[in-house]
Amino acid sequence: RGLGDVYKRQVKSMLDFDYIGVHPTGVVLVDQDRTGHKIHGVPVVSNLANVAEYVCREWFDEVLIVLPEDREIPQKVFDAFTEMGITIHVKIADVNEMQGKNQTVERMGNYTVITTCINMASAGQLILKRIMDICGGLVGCILTGIIFLFVAPAIYIKSPGPIFFSQYRVGKNGRKFKIYKFRSMYMDAEERKKELMKQNRVSDGLMFKMENDPRVIGSEKGPGKGIGNFIRKTSLDEFPQFFNVLKGDMSLIGTRPPTVDEWEKYELHHRARLAIKPGLTGMWQVSGRSEIMDFEEVVKLDTKYISEWSFMLDIKILFKTVLIVLGQKGSM
């Protein structure tokens, strides 16, 4: 028999993969004695019965064992490699290359598993991000208190009622939480939203954006007028969310949390943007903010942020956000 395609494919996989400092120097076939033949230039050096003796006499640093699911390496061969102090790698699964995904091998109970996720952040990185959130949340809550002294009377005079607006949003991996804002709309805003859906600039209903929203406090004075438009344009309405950041519902940087009704319309790939905690600001906000009307573009930017996340990327987005807010360009 000739050498099977399976063996050729496995050897080629080793040669093609960019192993640092590792070079295949020999192959052993478990069901054939083809000593002396070559597969893609790599010699078949022994059969299974004599492989331990061969490895003992030759120069080998490591052994990679790749077997089909219905075959097991004889325990005496495995024990022989261990006794010789050889580093052994055993294939536990065939994993297809997944673009933009990260994989690692972990222990879960008695199982050795391959973990695949959109971002493989370390515990240290997550702790650093949380420390930044706590520090930012504390400062933000203090600023929120100061802003409250000026904004609260202006809101109440124009629209008597609660100063704060709260609403359930969908956070990391589908967890629901209550988000807080300074109220920039009249009390019946949620009821009127259904009437205004035809004017939604995002056609699929996965976000709600419209020009000159009549629900905004003071909007009857004209486009961009009134206290409601002012606090939205300057993003002052978002400051109470620093309390959400401090609680741990949100992060300073992340993806914007959808409303429950928006989330219920999500397709499978949309859920990827919920793989991390939602944030006060994020990549799509600093890449166009309210000017982006294509939800698929939002999802693309959000998943790009998640897969490429680093602490320095958060710092860059944070500084860009400050510059954009100071320039009053759009709303968060």
Region spans (language model):
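Residue-level signature of catalytic and energy-coupling elements of molecular machines
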Residues: 2, 63, 88, 146, ...
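Generic recognition of well-ordered alpha-helical segments
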Residues: 12, 46, 53, 83, ...
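Short, glycine-rich, amphipathic interfacial segments at transmembrane boundaries or analogous
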Residues: 33-35, 95-96, 101-105, 164-218, ...
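Hydrophobic alpha-helical segments characteristic of transmembrane helices
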Residues: 85-87, 91-94, 237-245, 286-292
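Compositionally biased, charge-rich terminal segments
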Residues: 120, 296-311
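A hydrophobic, helix-centered structural microdomain
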Residues: 124-192, 244, 311, 316-332
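A short, structured surface patch at a secondary-structure boundary
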Residues: 205-277, 317-325
